[in-house]
Amino acid sequence: MQESKEPQNKFEGCQRISSSSSTLFGGTSFEEPRCGTSQGKEEDAFACNNGDHCSSITNVQEDDFVLPELLPSFEMYENLLSNIPQSSFDTYFPENPPFYEVASRNQSIPSEGESGNDMRILTGDIVGPDNHEVTVDGRRFASGPAESQIRNYDDTKGIPVENIYALPRIKTPIATELYVTKTAPKFGQLPKHESMLREYTSGDIIHGYFTVENKSTKPIKFDMFYLTLEGTTSSKTQSPFGIQKTTERILRMVDMAASWSYNHEDVNTGEDLCGFFDSIDKTSFGLPNSRILNPGDKRKKFFTFKIPNQLLDVTCKHGHFSHSLLPPTLGFDRPSSSHPELSTLKFSESLGYGRLSERGSSLWLNDSSSGSLINYSINAMIVGKDVASGRVCLMSEKKYSIRIVPFGFQNNPISREKCLKDLEDFDIEIANRLGMIEKVFSKIERAIPIHKEDIQEANRSDQLSPLRGKYEWNAVAGNTENGTLKKKH
């Protein structure tokens, strides 16, 4: 990765002080802007002009994008995203995360069992009198009120995040937009938006970014921002009470780097871009740690999702493998009856589809869905407190529908039949190679010249066709999908 020596934006009198510590995503940082005289260094990646925002030198990305395969810990997900506390979020997530600092001792010689330097966890510049220290293996860790603020809130009765759609919705001047791009978006560069007709398949990577803007003249406090890739199935049944619609959520993937967290790194480059201003779309990177959107403040963050090959094993309680495969998109996710464009929505015979003009709307295809629906979408949701009632509610939400056709023409579904065939083909290939080697050695021992035809003849798989059918599937009683492969004797 190379770094450009010319800043794309120049700014006046702005300087950033940051402190970061390594995390699962590469770094967690909090920062404090300071305006004053610039003490320029060539490596600072900051410059100044008449603007009021900060900018960084944009790193040049490699053309080949590699999605990190590092998964966050279950503990991190449980503490940050699995529950929605009904009390104040500030109790559990202070504005600045704790950071580690090496504290020196006054003693010149450390005592036995103690190290010369202590690692101390701090949440501010001063360790108050209420804080105390715990020594573990010669290392001291400061704890106190600040540590209790980031404790697990298992004892707090929270709302499971799966019930987020059941929360009451209120109208706020927060505008949320979602954009899907052809490649990984880059800071300071104009993105190339993906076509609405794009179909994704298993293993494909979805790139994009979102923007959140406060369009009012007053600061707005929010509690949490979630960015997910979700899949739902819906069906309609006739009952004595009318038509009932049943919806089940079959897939839920959370981008923890794009959702609100203390992390402000671009996952594509590993750069800490917190607070940097992008003149391309007039946005600042990252969501503020204070969770307060100032008037006119427009924020953005990048997201990345990888389409899975199958759902979780617990999707089918009977353990049928075929039931855990990712179903394809089916049907039309019709908007609510209050949508202004619903009355003018028409199916185009020439194009073969119909859709609303809104970005991210579902495609209406002639797929004979008969009221059934399988829909995949990227969802952005902002949760906060209603000022009037004090209850947790949805302050803003946005959905971007995507089409998924798993196991495209170049990818075959994983099945037991394919496993059997792969093993048999592998046996044939090994036998072919061994036969070729034996024939070559035999001719060498008899001093017979080796010709190209000898190798080609040994490579013919039809000579070894009796090898097929050497494996059989031992299915579990009552379940043909689960079992083991057994080699025939």
UniProtKB/Swiss-Prot annotation:
InterPro entries: Bul1-like, Bul1_N. Disruption phenotype: Increases readthrough at premature stop codons and leads to an increased rate of translation. One of its GO terms (molecular function) is ubiquitin-ubiquitin ligase activity. Residues 18-30 have a biased composition (Low complexity). Keywords: Phosphoprotein, Translation regulation, Ubl conjugation pathway. The modification Phosphoserine is found at residues 111, 350. One of its GO terms (biological process) is protein polyubiquitination. Residues 1-42 are annotated as: Disordered. It comes from the Eukaryota. GO terms for cellular component: ubiquitin ligase complex. Appears to play a role in translation fidelity, and may act when translation is compromised. May be a component of the ubiquitination pathway. Belongs to the BUL1 family. Open reading frame exhibits genomic organization compatible with a translational readthrough-dependent mode of expression. This is Bypass of stop codon protein 5. It comes from Saccharomyces cerevisiae (strain ATCC 204508 / S288c). The lineage of its organism: Eukaryota, Fungi, Dikarya, Ascomycota, Saccharomycotina.
